[in-house]
Amino acid sequence: MKSPFFLLFILLLGVALRGGTPIPHAMNQWPMASGPHGTWATTTEDEIPVRWSVSNDSNILWKRVLPEGGQSGIAIWNDRVFFTTNKPLREDTSLEETEGSDIIGYCLNAENGNVEWTVDIPSPKTMPYSGLFSDNSSATPITDGKHVWFINHGGLMLCHDMNGKEVWRRSFESRTRHNAKQCEPILVNDQVLFVTMRDSDDPLRRSMRAKPWARNTAPELWPWTFIRSFDAGTGKALWTGESGTSVHNTPRMGYVGGKAVVFHARGGGHRPPEIPYGFSMSRVSEEDAGRELWNHQSDRAVTYTVSHFDEYFAYGLDSGSLIKLDARSGEVVRDIPLFEKADIHLWNATTKQYEKHLDASFSIVTDRFKKEPTNQTPILTGKYYLFMTHEGHCVGRVNTESGKVEYLQVPVQVVRKQGVADRVLWDQHISSDGTNSRGMKTANDRRSRRDGWGHVTAGSPIAVNEFVFFSTMIGMTYVIDSQKTVFDESALISVNDLGQAGRTWSLSTPSYSQGRIFHRGLKQIVCIGSKRS
């Protein structure tokens, strides 16, 4: 019997997707980072694994050790799994030299994790491995069940058939002002959408007047980055967005008025050159593809998020508020302060119980905090907008209809060892050593030893039915029931691990397909769930 939530969610999803779906026959697949609908969410009647432990080998169907780490998410189509890693380093490589330009695309068997084929994906741009905000392997592959597309952020797109035969390749220039490259490629209407600069021979491209890698030079000296469209079958460039898009932003596609659109943003840290800062909704198809529907300007826009919206409203973060915009016009419908007045459920370390604080300021959690989320962690599921806070280790939930704000504090880490009781850490963590499967340290940024909240590009969350999966750099995955009437401790379904505390590191997004969760860290990729009957 279908649950009332499932029926309601299907109804809401049908409204949201009234214009169609981006990839035919993808309902039970996970064809790109943002899932079958491009929304980072899906519904299912299949089993949803919500509890597991790689440390204890609990609810793990298979594990595949990887020769080198990487940061991409995982695309799945039937019995095929696609992802990328960095090219394996020589074993005598020092920590200071853990960088490279090339990555490797993988195709695994979804039933047992066996390697079906791999492909080398070179590029001209060298990047540090295991970067705190991205590396060359960060883009998740996309697939439609007939082809798979891989992107090396350093400057190369590849299209292969499902057997590994190359169909086409296309080079592009990767800007060197920022290491961060947050865009996840999108497949919609036989187009691959990706954020990059115009080609060097494009007369509309702004001239490059800064020296490469001179990141502190004036932003106006640099060319802009845009959402660009490429023919999925040939790699031919189709159109370039009317307005720029920041490298910090993860654009999201959807449908407004039955038409495919993409919501994107400009702004962020280290002065991105694309101006004016703010949020835009742009067309994806037909004769006006790339043209803006509207542009909402804001000098204080928080852009290092997935840009979520539905058919009626779009959501942006701005100076400690969630801004609710009309999806058709961009007009501000509501400004919801996030940190001034909220119901906050905090863990009391003395009483070992949760305490509820009504209509409280977030300052009761911590007196020093940034009014923004952990990078890339917001998600929209039904009427609720959820995110991981920058400080305080709380999951925030906003009712976008009523404006009610709630916070639930969660453990920083759960340490598990076979035969030993779990150790729950609330205000400290065991730092990851940042090693790959060969025991080589590859995470050279000292901030890589932090707990994975705050100033880091976390793997973006996904939603499967009511369950939201949030992941952190130290290998924790929180499963949250997003639809609980009261957002208290009952909404924390589980805290799961991707491996041993202190030896696990991940900035990847999980994926769901046909009753299984797929996830990864530097050392291995895992399939979570049970064998099919």
Where do the PLM segments sit?
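Noncatalytic, solvent-exposed loop/strand surfaces
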Residues: 20-533
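Positively charged n-region of N-terminal signal peptides that target proteins for export
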Residues: 1-5
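Bacterial N-terminal signal peptides
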Residues: 6-16
